[in-house]
Amino acid sequence: MAFGRGRGNKRTSTSSYASTITMVIFVALCVFGVWMLSSNSVIPPQITQGSTRAAVAETERSDVSASSNGNDEPEPTKQESDEQQAFEDNPGKLPDDAVKSEDEQRKSAKEKSETTSSKTQTQETQQNNDDKISEEKEKDNGKENQTVQESEEGQMKKVVKEFEKEQKQQRDEDAGTQPKGTQGQEQGQGKEQPDVEQGNKQGQEQDSNTDVTFTDATKQEQPMETGQGETSETSKNEENGQPEEQNSGNEETGQQNEEKTTASEENGKGEKSMKDENGQQEEHTTAEEESGNKEEESTSKDENMEQQEERKDEKKHEQGSEASGFGSGIPKESAESQKSWKSQATESKDEKQRQTSESNTVERIMDGNAWVLCNATAGTDYIPCLDNEEAIMKLRSRRHFEHRERHCPEDPPTCLVPLPEGYKEAIKWPESRDKIWYHNVPHTKLAEVKGHQNWVKVTGEFLTFPGGGTQFIHGALHYIDFLQQSLKNIAWGKRTRVILDVGCGVASFGGFLFERDVIAMSLAPKDEHEAQVQFALERKIPAISAVMGSKRLPFPSRVFDLIHCARCRVPWHNEGGMLLLELNRMLRPGGYFVWSATPVYQKLEEDVQIWKEMSALTKSLCWELVTINKDKLNGIGAAIYQKPATNECYEKRKHNKPPLCKNNDDANAAWYVPLQACMHKVPTNVVERGSKWPVNWPRRLQTPPYWLNSSQMGIYGKPAPRDFTTDYEHWKHVVSKVYMNEIGISWSNVRNVMDMRAVYGGFAAALKDLQVWVMNVVNINSPDTLPIIYERGLFGIYHDWCESFSTYPRSYDLLHADHLFSKLRTRCNLVPVMAEVDRIVRPGGKLIVRDESNVIREVENMLKSLHWDVHLTFSKHQEGILSAQKGFWRPETSQ
């Protein structure tokens, strides 16, 4: 029970005596009224706390619906309707006969279920109580009465209406049946009542999942029983905007019997205590105050509704904590404390809103309506990181071909690259090596400039490739055999397996090396030699768009068996030989550099000067000029150099120029790393990579590299050599059993393949017997396993899939992504990544995704929005697989 602010303790003995007499008279009137009501089954809700408590307990489950009855009066929450005190100023205990009569009258009322004169008697008794208590109130300090009255009039009306509803419910029940939890309250007395009410409250909460106002009661029952009632009570007062002094008034009257009962009830109900204080003030409210405070009561109603909504969000967490047994002994936090301290939820709110905004963007794109065509100058050949005109215009210099290097936009594009007019499905390999559809790569300038060198010619609706080049106009195969004859130790397809072709042109050299079981990483810049790399990729020959400029190429150190340059227009001798030093970094110790250029065999003044400078530079690099040979058929010559396999020459040089790199310089670092004019030493430790030449092809494909030792932990948790072997066996099984037969993919027209997240290169190794080549991509934030891939006779590149890949649109027949997107989604948005996938894959091309089930669903939705044909999706144990095929659909709108 709650009282006025400290008034009970400050009264004189006369005032206390008068109050006692008034109480006795009032009790007598109550007994008389009860006797009169015994035949009418009327139970005034404001007479005793026991009757009020019982009435509220029976109607707790209907609080939410009752709170929306449309009246102008403030609608009390459950806490406000739990207990109603009739004697504010009397600290004494109610007579036992009064309580007993009340209980008997309640039972009688429930048995008869008659409600005919309930309203009238309730209002009369309420008026009598109001008159008597108003007289006593005039003797006391009424500082707080107005505030309390504003909120309590509506509460009294609420209790009456709840009681009437209770009687209506009783008429529908069998005679003598009581609502759940009521009987225990009627039989309980004194300290036993809170325990019964606690059980009732828990049962009611279990019965109702939508009960908003009951949220905090159960959570507070055990803390109150362990002596933390004060904290919880204060917390509840703060939540309801009530001063703490009203609670302290209850605690200061602890010597009175009636207060003991009230304290017990407060300990059992916790959150309800402030509502009880509101309840005992109902008798002070007059009809005049009711009509004068309508507007303020409406404001109170809004505040109560807001509090109910806040508690509704907390209910699930509180019930879960109570059910687990973790709620005991924990005081309830106040609304003020929650405002003062930021929670994880509030701190994360802005971030969630940001992500929601991104998610909405994803949803708009995924519905297929937000995809638009790119509006770039490059048109159908758009490469975002190489055609960033804004970044290129800001370059301070183009001396080192900076304008041909990567400059990715800050915001990765989500637009789609349009198709060339008249585009057709690409011609299959090996026919594609000799001819392609003109409309697929509609560029004729190169044919005009290089046609006489047998690079490319226009033949009707085809572009044909005689197989020639600047240095081998009579065909690449003859030139390849010429190099083999010049140096037998080259041993194509055995000792020499992976090469780098710099300035590849249309990549005829690399295209015909397949017949010698050699794979070539061909590169050329996107320059005035129109679409030369695009020609190569359309011919189904591996190539990337790159330039020897100011930064290292995205390859590890000491991985290429041979590097080739046939009039590649690279000034190797300039800048202290910086570009040649980059080749030295990538060339395997003991590997060869083949230089087929005019300075080797012509005697023009310029060529002679270049030859002298080149000879001095290669000597300072300790490269040995193994042979110079001339090809009479083509009228050209080639110089072949070999990189040293030891450091002996480096240590004997008279001049330290170019200098050796510092010991802490990482030769493998290659992602946007500037070039340096220095040399890295050759590894001498027998267990270090580069100290030995790999075993011959094809045995090197499945042989663990010698520098992987058993004490080293592999990517999948096994010792590195066994991890390597296990990965290979795994992918052989997956490819043969699943990819070849069960995912709806026809491999007959698959040639250009990319493994978007290669580890050991096991997927590419498993495709060895197919007529395909695989670009193995090692992500920059993944373990650096790219040297292992090269060691086994495969090739690959470093890349970050949050950026665009350095290749032309419509380059690949199949992309393979093994657990890529789940790792990318923590770093970048998947929508630009999927737009990049759509850019890289040619119409009719395929995509295989293995990933978490939720990622598979997300990717599937985006693919469908792109009008891809999804062949298969399968999930098991939170893992899934998806295969899809790209069509010819393009959006109708542009940026």
From Swiss-Prot:
InterPro entries: Put_SAM_MeTrfase, SAM-dependent_MTases_sf. It is a single-pass type II membrane protein. It is an enzyme of class 2 (transferase). The chain crosses the membrane at residues 17-37. It is found in: Endoplasmic reticulum membrane. GO terms for biological process: methylation. Its EC number is 2.1.1.-. Residues 115-127, 176-191 have a biased composition (Low complexity). Belongs to the methyltransferase superfamily. This is Probable methyltransferase PMT27. It comes from Arabidopsis thaliana.
